[in-house]
A protein has these predicted regions:
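Hydrophobic/aromatic beta-strand elements that line small-molecule binding cavities or substrate pockets
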Residues: 35-37, 63, 89-96, 120-129
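A short, structured loop/turn motif at beta-sheet edges
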Residues: 43-44, 67-68, 95-102, 126-136, ...
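A conserved amphipathic terminal alpha-helix motif
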Residues: 143-200
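Hydrophobic pocket/interface hotspot
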Residues: 46, 56, 74-76, 94, ...
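Beta-strand/loop substructures that line and gate deep hydrophobic ligand-binding cavities in soluble
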Residues: 113-159
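Hydrophobic ligand-binding cavity/cleft-lining segments
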Residues: 7, 12-65, 198-200
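Intrinsic-disorder/low-complexity, polar/charged segments enriched in Ser/Thr/Lys/Arg/Asp/Glu/Gln
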Residues: 30-36, 73, 89, 102, ...
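Short beta-edge strand/loop motif at the mouth of beta-sheet-based domains
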Residues: 34, 54-89, 187
Length: 200
């Protein structure tokens, strides 16, 4: 069967998704990581926590750079005293921004994943007002590759984003984090073997 569009005959096939044959389910990337949390704060306050350098320092990392526009820099510096390349999410870029609604940024991989460290995935934050809790923050980390190292990075971030949202909650309850005295439960070094086994 063909469809005539502006004088061109376009064949219609049974593949309604128009998915190329080479892009099979077996070869597709790892599933996104989804995390959400209700935060007892206004949407504007939560938005500023993610989109200002002062906000980044209050819960996310010791230092940060935010240029809140498309293609602006978004750096989250967990170890600002380290040499370049070992300080955190350095030189990431804002891909999309809708004030108080949505922020999409590129994201690199931690240094322990050496062969993919400079590869970029994407992180999307969404913000939604809720009557029962204040603001819902949704995190989607996606765009993973297909190797075992990508799978390990995905597992790492699954736990990391939970910890980051724990920090966000904590700073609204107790004030900005003191980076020289962070409670033990707000540190994250990677998934435990038990957590990794449970996710498989």
């Amino acid at each position: 069967m063909t469809l005539l569009i502006s004088g061109f005959a376009v064949p219609l096939t049974a593949n309604a998704t128009n998915q190329p044959a080479a892009w099979s389910a077996e070869e597709s990337e790892l599933a996104p990581v989804y995390i959400s949390r209700c935060i007892d704060a206004s949407i504007q306050t939560v938005w500023e926590s993610w989109t200002t350098a002062a906000g980044i320092r209050s819960f996310f990392a010791r230092d940060g750079v935010v240029e809140p526009h498309v293609d602006g820099e978004y750096s989250v510096l967990f170890f600002p005293e380290n040499p370049p390349g070992l300080r955190g999410a350095e030189g990431m870029r804002i891909v999309a921004i809708e004030p108080s609604k949505r922020l999409v940024i590129t994201w690199n991989q931690p240094p322990q994943f050496a062969t993919i460290k400079e590869q970029r995935a994407l992180v999307e934050y969404r913000f939604r007002e809720r009557n029962d809790c204040g603001t819902e923050v949704q995190v989607k980390h996606f765009g993973w590759g297909q190797s075992d190292e990508w799978a390990q990075a995905r597992e790492y971030f699954r736990g990391a984003w939970e910890t980051i949202l724990d920090r966000l909650e904590y700073q609204y309850e107790h004030g900005p984090l003191d980076w020289d005295n962070v409670p033990d439960h707000l540190w994250y070094t990677g998934p435990t073997a038990a957590a990794t086994d449970a996710s498989n």
